Curated annotation (Swiss-Prot):
Cell compartment(s), UniProt: Nucleus
Organism annotation: Homo sapiens
GO BP terms in the entry: regulation of transcription by RNA polymerase II
Entry keyword Nucleotidyltransferase: no
Protein name: Zinc finger protein 696
GO (cellular component) term, any one: nucleus
Keywords carried by this UniProt record: DNA-binding, Metal-binding, Nucleus, Repeat, Transcription, Transcription regulation, Zinc, Zinc-finger
Cited function: May be involved in transcriptional regulation.
Stretches the record annotates as Disordered: 30-119
Domain of life (superkingdom): Eukaryota
Span of zinc fingers (C2H2-type): 125-147, 153-175, 181-203, 209-231, 237-259, 265-287, 293-315, 321-343, 349-371
Family: Belongs to the krueppel C2H2-type zinc-finger protein family.
Keyword field contains Disulfide bond: no
């Protein structure tokens, strides 16, 4: 004991406690706010106070100790995926130069200043090809396979390869017929969750994809893309026989039947056959007399929606079909085509008796009376 002072042991203990408290405060100031691992590490830094007499080096080796819970969620997941479910072996600590039972907090590619809390925090694993960053090294490794083209996961049934193992699992449902995602409204089941989400919009009426030109909304992104072609005039699908192009692939399939003479849809009433099911439905209204499309202005009803659209233009005065030669406009497309023959000289209606051709069908009908045909 020093004269007139505290006992030497008590003074040394007090000084040590003050030093540890300062270390704790400094460490917490450097750690992210609310960090659980920082609080645990700081708490552990006070533990050597009870072992003040322990030789240097038997406690924590240089700097704040690693917290037991500091292994991140991604690393824990990686550990579970390794054989035996154990973390990687000891690695060299970048902070101390020695070995640690856990990986360093600073990733190998973090760059200068990473230990001081640089911009790597949160997503410390960047892709060298595109710069995108990831929270987990395993996610970064999976992403890099997109650039390398590597597809290590292969379907055992058909041999198709995939980038991610989860993609193989989804693909194999096509072979097994498994459909684990069922709609709670109607019970329809799907092999993939995103197909169920798309289907549910049928029940909810949700239409998140709106056309930027006219505002019309759609429940499916693909339907919105198809609709956009009506504004752009883009026709991606061409007929291999004649080169005629169409907005939709289904239109090409129907068109090809005109080349092959295929008419798979037959009327049960009269036996007339059609290349398209929609044409058969329209034809059947001739027998039933059904006219489901009524004009809201005058009440007149029509068997086809296209007839109603053309009729509505009588009330609105709309004439959307304009001649490029003389500028004359027409309500109906049929009138526009008839007018075009004035400029082109086309005469598609030919008499089978004498070979004379006409521009309009009713002119041919009138001419045939010359030959005595009704």
């Amino acid at each position: 004991m020093e004269p007139g002072g505290e006992p030497t042991g008590a003074k040394e203990s007090s000084t040590l406690m003050e030093s540890l408290a300062a270390v704790k405060a400094a460490f917490l100031a450097q750690a992210p706010s609310g960090s659980r691992s920082a609080e645990v590490q700081a708490a552990q830094s006070t533990e050597p106070a009870a072992e003040a007499g322990a030789p240097e080096g038997e406690g924590h080796r240089g700097g704040p100790p690693r917290a037991l819970g500091s292994l991140g969620l991604c690393e824990n997941q990686e550990a579970r995926e390794r054989p035996g479910g154990s973390p990687r072996g000891p690695v060299t600590s970048e902070k101390t130069g020695g070995q640690s039972g856990l990986e360093s907090d600073v990733p190998p590619n973090a760059g200068p200043g990473a230990e001081g809390g640089g911009s790597w925090k949160g997503r410390p694993f960047p892709c060298g090809a595109c710069g995108r960053s990831f929270k987990c090294s395993s996610d970064a490794a999976k992403h890099r396979s997109i650039h390398s083209g590597e597809k290590p996961y292969e379907c055992s049934d058909c041999g198709k390869a995939f980038i991610h193992s989860s993609h193989v699992v989804r693909h194999q449902r096509a072979h097994s017929g498994e459909r684990p995602y069922a709609c709670a409204e109607c019970g329809k089941a799907f092999g993939q969750s995103f197909n169920l989400l798309r289907h549910q919009r049928v029940h909810t009426g949700e239409k998140p994809y709106a056309c930027a030109d006219c505002g019309k909304a759609f429940g499916q992104r693909s339907d919105a893309a198809k609709h956009r072609r009506t504004h752009t005039g883009e026709r991606l699908y061409a007929c291999g026989e004649c080169g005629k192009r169409f907005l939709h692939s289904s239109n090409v399939v129907r068109h090809r039947r005109t080349h092959h003479g295929e008419n798979p849809y037959e009327c049960r009433e009269c036996g007339q056959a059609f290349s398209q099911s929609s044409n058969l439905l329209q034809h059947q209204r001739v027998h039933t007399g059904e006219r489901p499309f009524a004009c809201q202005d005058c009440g007149r009803a029509f068997s086809r929606s296209s007839f109603l659209r053309e009729h509505r233009r009588i009330h609105t005065g709309e004439k959307p079909h304009q001649c490029g030669h003389c500028g004359r406009a027409f309500r109906a497309l049929s009138g526009f085509f008839r007018h075009q023959r004035l400029h082109t000289g086309e005469k598609p209606f030919r008499c089978t008796e004498c070979g004379r051709a006409f521009r309009l069908s009713f002119h041919l009908i009138q001419h045939r009376r010359v030959h005595g045909a009704e």
